[in-house]
Amino acid sequence: LDVNVIFKGTQNGYEWDDNGEGAYLMESDCQRAAADYINRLPKEYGNHLTVSGHSKGGNKAQYVTITTNRVARCVAEDGQGFSNEFCRQYHFVIEDRKNRIKNYCAENDYVNVIANTIAGTSIYIKTEFQINPFLYHKPNLILTQKGDFREEGRQAEWTKGLHSYFQEILDLMPEPQRSYVIDGVMGLLEGKDSEESAYNRMYSVLTAGGYWLAWMTEQTQWFG
């Protein structure tokens, strides 16, 4: 029996908040709900499921591969990473199962670089130039008009730098500033539907900007 489970990406403000929590908590509510769904599937579906999803869906797919015993293969797209706390808690399981996980990413995608990557294989796909950089996260960007994968490429240098910056926040920013900044940035992405106040969002951006400047001055490969 070939059973495939596909998780959807971020749909609303609550899930944007949950994205942020997944970067500084061991587990988020949506991640736990995804694992509960997998565990409630009929026993006759077996323990060799294939899971997939884009963005938040890709994160959920990776999460259930690690935290349940029912997944044999994970094919994620542009799935974001996990908190330091999660990686410490599940270190040995991640090492044992990471080769079940492939994360297909547009070479300029900026979401897959958020937090800690646990995929055993990350595959970067060449994409057409986008005037609006937010469009590099579109799920169909890595496919041709016929629905085939585009040619493989390499991760863009600027997204490598973005990943290093995110790690700077996760590793060095103390609490409660760390969660405050992450929640505020997610509030900006939510826009007018955000539960974060305009003051909180602006404070978060300014704090994150200060860390960005400090991080940039330490990049000797750019500034000598």
What are the language-model segments listed below?
Residues L1-V3, F7-H48, T68-G224:
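Alpha/beta hydrolase fold serine-hydrolase catalytic domain that processes acyl esters and thioesters
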Residues A61-T67:
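Short glycine-enriched nucleophile-adjacent loop
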Residues S52-G57, A61:
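Gly/Ala-rich beta-loop-alpha elbow adjacent to hydrolase catalytic centers
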